[in-house]
Amino acid sequence: MTDVPVSRIRNFSIIAHIDHGKSTLADRLLEATGTVSAREMKPQLLDNMELERERGITIKLQAARMNYRAQDGQDYVLNLIDTPGHVDFTYEVSRSLAACEGALLVVDASQGVEAQTLANVYLALENNLEIIPVINKIDLPGAEPERVIAEIEQVIGLDCSGAILASAKMGIGIPEILEAIVQRVPPPRDTVADPLRALIFDSYYDSYRGVIVYVRIMDGEVKTGDKICFMASGREYEITELGVMRPHQESVASLHAGEVGYIAAAIKSVEHARVGDTITLVHRKASEPLPGYKEAKPMVFCGLFPSNSDQYAELKEALEKLKLNDAALYFEPEVSPAMGFGFRCGFLGLLHMEVVQERLEREYNLDLVITAPTVVYQVTLNDGSVIRVDNPSKLPPPNERTSIEEPIVRVEVILPEEFVGTVMELCETKRGTFKDMKYLAQGRTTLVYELPLAEVVTDFFDQLKSRTRGYASMDYQMVGYRADDLVRLDILINGDVVDSLSTIVHRDKAFYVGRSLVAKLRELIPRHQFEVPIQAAIGSRVIARETIPALRKNVLAKCYGGDVTRKRKLLEKQKEGKKRMKAVGTVEVPQEAFMAVLKLQND
């Protein structure tokens, strides 16, 4: 079926906020075109990671090729490139959109436009895609398609005269959607004669065939056995297998401009086949790569340590395997006196961090200790040089630096207007600066704030959801760095600094954070044979302290009557012993203590 002319190929993706029915719609399209038989059909067919099904989110990109006979009697090939809808995976979305000519904008008829939808629509508009609005879930009792159409026109500025009303669950509107894709999405440019340029929009590691690269052929043609070159890394390989996804892989002899398929070429690591990179032929190279390739930059860092130090090698292997599939994951070895050997890992955002952590625990049976997430600070030293600090324990002392700058994000929240007050208050407590506020149709509002990323990564999202009873949605983008009065807060247990508990906080908040941290640790660290002081300090100045009293045996149990000096002697002896113990004893800090610090509300 590879002999379809370029004019009858349509490449499209589906843009939607989480839970607006994107995966279900994809399932219906696969069914309606007969790509998947009823026997193979299962809900959310393209979400093939166990974790994706469970959380109901799409993490990794999937692609599927469908054959469709349109009403004009012609056979078309429709390539659906599924996109993740979550804020952390924006780069994945952007490069999958770059592989398309059109997009279905799916909006829930009862919920309306959400913040994440907006962010992805702007990405689609940047890539000049034809956008087809689809109002989904019209079968719900609370559906208000007219209101939602008005909202899309008002908020995004799209013409919705051709919007399609649908219900993916009930199968309503599916034929109209397929026709709209054929009629309204432009075909790819016919550049089969040009030198090969293929855009990598995803890759995953197969233990038998090496890395399988998902590509959209932009120009030229590629055949099995061709020698190819990756333009960003300069590496060369020979193609062992070419194919298309229906959504199960099916080998073909060649792929030409406009088509979407996969390439296997015995590639050892996803590192070598970076997403967004351009593939070209060795003997006929393209003059320049496709635009838009960016190195994925980690924004949130944390330490991962095996709770049992014997598992260090397994953790390393597991991270390397995940890295094969996840180019945005970054890690380097780290040693912590409190936690032993582990890794410092960088992630795109909080959800990405949780997903990686859960996959490590689930798929590789590891038991992990995770330190508090931190962001990357820019520190200007006395000599004028700037360093990037992703770990609070590496922050230079105050006398060696002139300023600390923290990353600032622009947060856009869409919410019902009755919650505006409480959300504005939340943003103020998180050191936010108010930027903009717009009233939308039907009592909804958008709020725009600039907030320090450090405040967003802890528990901002949870608090936002609880303050708005789950009705708010948010999206954030980096806007740059800004200097502020930041200090490093150290936690000392029994006089020793526990580096994994150090955090960088704003000076105004240091006292409150320190006080609540030591109070929390006091509850969680078990009592020892000697008393254990827990202190929060900025530099050498202690700002909060709690003491865990010692466990004591009743040494007076065997003295019935007798002289008080006898009792005193025994008590003194016990006290001496405790003192000696304290000098040499070490304090066990349980994992719960680290996790509690992580979850601590910055009230």
Swiss-Prot record:
InterPro entries attached to this UniProt entry: EF-4, EFG_III/V, EFG_V-like, EFTu-like_2, G_TR_CS, GUFP, LepA_C_sf, LepA_CTD
Reaction(s) this enzyme catalyzes, per UniProt: GTP + H2O = GDP + phosphate + H(+)
Subcellular location per UniProt equals: Cell inner membrane
Its Enzyme Commission number? Answer: 3.6.5.n1
Q: How does it sit in the membrane?
A: Peripheral membrane protein
This protein's source sits in the domain of life called: Bacteria
* Annotated GO MF terms: GTP binding; GTPase activity; ribosome binding
* Domain (tr-type G) ranges: 7-189
Per the UniProt entry, what is one GO biological process? positive regulation of translation
Q: Does the keyword Cell inner membrane apply?
A: yes
Q: Which GO terms describe its cellular component?
A: plasma membrane
Cross-referenced Pfam families, in alphabetical order?
Answer: EFG_C, GTP_EFTU, GTP_EFTU_D2, LepA_C
This protein's UniProt keywords: Cell inner membrane, Cell membrane, GTP-binding, Hydrolase, Membrane, Nucleotide-binding, Protein biosynthesis
Binding positions (GTP): 19-24, 136-139
Q: What is the enzyme's class at the highest EC level?
A: hydrolase
User: PANTHER family given for it?
Assistant: TRANSLATION FACTOR GUF1 HOMOLOG, CHLOROPLASTIC, TRANSLATION FACTOR GUF1-RELATED
Q: What does this chain do?
A: Required for accurate and efficient protein synthesis under certain stress conditions. May act as a fidelity factor of the translation reaction, by catalyzing a one-codon backward translocation of tRNAs on improperly translocated ribosomes. Back-translocation proceeds from a post-translocation (POST) complex to a pre-translocation (PRE) complex, thus giving elongation factor G a second chance to translocate the tRNAs correctly. Binds to ribosomes in a GTP-dependent manner.
Question: What family classification does the UniProt entry report for this protein?
Answer: Belongs to the TRAFAC class translation factor GTPase superfamily. Classic translation factor GTPase family. LepA subfamily.
Q: Which HAMAP family match?
A: GUFP (MF_03138), LepA (MF_00071)
- Its recorded name reads Elongation factor 4
Q: Which organism is it from?
A: Synechococcus sp. (strain JA-3-3Ab)
The uppermost taxa in this organism's lineage are: Bacteria, Bacillati, Cyanobacteriota, Cyanophyceae, Synechococcales
